[in-house]
A protein has these predicted regions:
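Substrate-binding pocket helix/loop in short-chain dehydrogenase/reductase
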Residues: 98-99, 103-111, 207
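Active-site loop immediately N-terminal to the catalytic Tyr-X3-Lys motif
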Residues: 100, 148-154, 176, 214, ...
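Alpha-helical segment proximal to the catalytic Tyr-Lys
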Residues: 127, 172-176, 235
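Residue(s) in the substrate-gating loop at a strand-loop-helix junction
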Residues: 143
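Short C-terminal tail/terminal secondary-structure segment
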Residues: 148, 227, 238-255
Length: 255
């Protein structure tokens, strides 16, 4: 895939799946903005590594809970790279709690980042592409839990289900402007957020028994799909969810 000339913004791009996507887009020729909310040193390290590939990269801090910061993020991204034509909505959080114990604070913590944040980052990106009268690509990092239940993570599932329907609606609204939008739905991916699971042999064995390919996914598995969706090879794909789960969705039973 050739992403030469592409300029991408990856939210939550300093760690985990977002970091892997940022590296892969750069390796394919794109310049990249790394959005982060904390741990500036992680974001700066990603910038340093991307520059070693001969690409432009900048890190911008923004809390996606606030629309004013989102607008600033898009403005700074455009100024820093001379425009952005690929948006990767990767930033996301989760909160484990039985439904009857979820507080308003817990709910807002998850929905503000996962859905509200993605909604308004996408809106600001679309306005930019309309202003310059050019097409664009939006890639949402959703989850298999936009379809599958996940007990004790109801707010998370609600956010990803909402992201799915936002994507489907926008695929119709944005098509006349040449802007495509798709979801990537990762399954169980080996990232720092899953450290507790990885250190629990019993839970890990039960999970792997649900995955036909018999292994956890790697961040590179997701990054490869993101690079494809950012490329011209995906120009006729919009409104789709690409599942990256080793077959988990079709062989799933909640433990």
């Amino acid at each position: 895939m050739n992403l030469s000339g592409k300029k991408a913004l990856v939210t939550g791009g300093s760690q985990g799946i977002g970091q892997a996507i940022a590296y892969r887009l750069a390796a394919e020729g794109a310049d990249v903005v790394i959005d982060y909310v904390g741990h500036a040193e992680f974001a700066q390290q990603v910038v340093t590594e991307i520059k070693k590939l001969g690409r432009q990269a900048i890190a911008i801090q923004a809390n996606l809970d606030f629309v004013s910061e989102i607008q600033g993020l898009i403005q700074k991204s455009v100024e820093g790279l001379g425009g952005i034509d690929v948006l990767v909505n990767n930033a996301g959080v989760e909160k484990h709690a039985p439904f009857w114990e979820v507080t308003e604070k817990d709910y807002d913590f998850v929905l503000d980042t996962n859905l509200k944040g993605a909604f308004f980052v996408t809106q600001a990106f679309v306005r930019h592409r309309m202003d310059v009268k050019q097409p664009g690509k939006i890639i949402n990092i959703s989850s298999v839990h936009e379809e599958l239940p996940f007990p004790h993570f109801t707010s998370y599932c609600a956010s990803k289900g909402g992201m799915k329907m936002m994507m489907r609606n926008l695929s119709i609204e944005l098509a006349p402007y040449g802007i495509t939008i798709n979801d990537i739905a990762p399954g169980a991916i080996e990232t720092p957020i899953n450290t507790q699971l990885l250190n629990d042999p019993v839970k890990l064995k039960a999970l792997l028994a649900n995955i036909p390919l018999g292994r956890l996914g790697q961040t590179s598995d997701v990054a490869g799909v993101a690079a494809f969706l950012a490329s011209n090879d995906s120009d006729y794909i919009t409104g789709a969810t690409i599942v990256v789960d080793g077959g988990l969705t079709w062989n799933y039973s909640e433990q």
